[in-house]
């Protein structure tokens, strides 16, 4: 998979082949695609919708593409999402762990449910929230129906999913699994500062230059006319 992406990107950032990969990964066909392609050239991936299979495929493809282009450079994942499918979110999460790059995360607007999960899964020390971002944590939801046997199987899977998410959030935040279970039993809302205190993020930032990579001219910058402007891992705690 990585080798395939490498071959597609050998011609460089401005190549037609790379533009084709970007367009396919974005899932967009409008003028917005130009914006997201430009961000991708600067190693910025934007999650700005409900997390579903198509979105997860696009985000995961972008992470793999950026990892293939430069296995060492940070990737920045901006999150403004109310959450969505657990399986789709876990696909993004596992890809964040799969690539060798640090994946910094930045919350703006709302990072709720699976959005919160992906936010806290950023590389330790590189998880950011803008000052008015809201973060919401809760337990996974899902409908159960069918025969008694079906209901039993579905309930077992729900408990497994719930426990897995709690264990991963505990790992990334430093909280105990028991504390996460208690706090996520109902919707738990955090301001940016409260999220920092809880361990969901590491920094609350107001300006791009408060992120070290911006100062060094890497990652978050929109490279234009010599200017560097803008730019966020995972289960291993890297």
From Swiss-Prot:
InterPro entries from the UniProt entry: ClpP, ClpP/crotonase-like_dom_sf, ClpP/TepA, ClpP_His_AS
E.C. number(s) listed in UniProt: 3.4.21.92
Top-level taxonomic group: Bacteria
PROSITE patterns to which the protein is assigned, alphabetical: CLP_PROTEASE_HIS
CC terms in the record's Gene Ontology section: cytoplasm; endopeptidase Clp complex
Signal sequence extent: none
Active site per UniProt: 113, 138
GO BP terms, alphabetized: protein quality control for misfolded or incompletely synthesized proteins
Pfam families in UniProt: CLP_protease
Gene3D superfamilies: 2-enoyl-CoA Hydratase, Chain A, domain 1 (3.90.226.10)
Subcellular location: Cytoplasm
Keywords linked to the UniProt accession: Cytoplasm, Hydrolase, Protease, Serine protease
Major localisation: cytoplasm
Gene Ontology molecular function: any one: serine-type endopeptidase activity
Keyword match Hydrolase: yes
Reactions the enzyme catalyzes: Hydrolysis of proteins to small peptides in the presence of ATP and magnesium. alpha-casein is the usual test substrate. In the absence of ATP, only oligopeptides shorter than five residues are hydrolyzed (such as succinyl-Leu-Tyr-|-NHMec, and Leu-Tyr-Leu-|-Tyr-Trp, in which cleavage of the -Tyr-|-Leu- and -Tyr-|-Trp bonds also occurs)
Subunit architecture: Fourteen ClpP subunits assemble into 2 heptameric rings which stack back to back to give a disk-like structure with a central cavity, resembling the structure of eukaryotic proteasomes.
Protein family: Belongs to the peptidase S14 family.
Protein task: Cleaves peptides in various proteins in a process that requires ATP hydrolysis. Has a chymotrypsin-like activity. Plays a major role in the degradation of misfolded proteins.
NCBIfam families per record: PRK00277.1 (NF001368), PRK12553.1 (NF009205)
Protein's name according to its UniProt entry: ATP-dependent Clp protease proteolytic subunit 4
Organism from which the protein derives: Frankia casuarinae (strain DSM 45818 / CECT 9043 / HFP020203 / CcI3)
């Amino acid at each position: 998979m990585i080798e395939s992406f490498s071959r597609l990107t050998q011609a460089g950032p401005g190549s037609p082949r790379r533009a084709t990969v970007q367009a396919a990964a974005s899932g967009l066909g409008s003028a917005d695609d130009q914006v997201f392609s430009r961000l991708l050239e600067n190693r910025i991936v934007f999650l700005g919708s409900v997390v579903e299979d198509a979105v997860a495929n696009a985000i995961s493809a972008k992470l793999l593409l950026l990892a293939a282009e430069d296995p060492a450079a940070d990737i920045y994942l901006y999150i403004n999402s109310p959450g969505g499918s657990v399986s789709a979110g876990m696909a993004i999460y596992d890809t964040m762990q799969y690539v060798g790059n640090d994946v910094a995360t930045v919350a703006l607007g709302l990072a709720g449910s699976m959005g919160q999960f992906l936010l806290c899964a950023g590389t330790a020390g590189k998880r950011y929230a803008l000052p008015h971002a809201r973060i919401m944590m809760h337990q996974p939801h899902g409908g159960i129906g069918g025969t008694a046997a079906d209901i039993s199987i579905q309930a077992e899977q729900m408990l497994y999913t719930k426990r897995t998410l709690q264990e991963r959030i505990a790992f990334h935040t430093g909280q105990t699994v028991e504390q996460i279970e208690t706090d996520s039993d109902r919707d738990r809302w955090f301001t940016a500062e409260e999220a920092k205190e809880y361990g969901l993020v590491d920094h609350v930032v107001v300006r791009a230059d408060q992120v070290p990579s911006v100062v060094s001219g890497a990652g978050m910058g929109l490279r234009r006319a010599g200017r560097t402007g803008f730019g966020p891992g995972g289960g291993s705690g890297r």
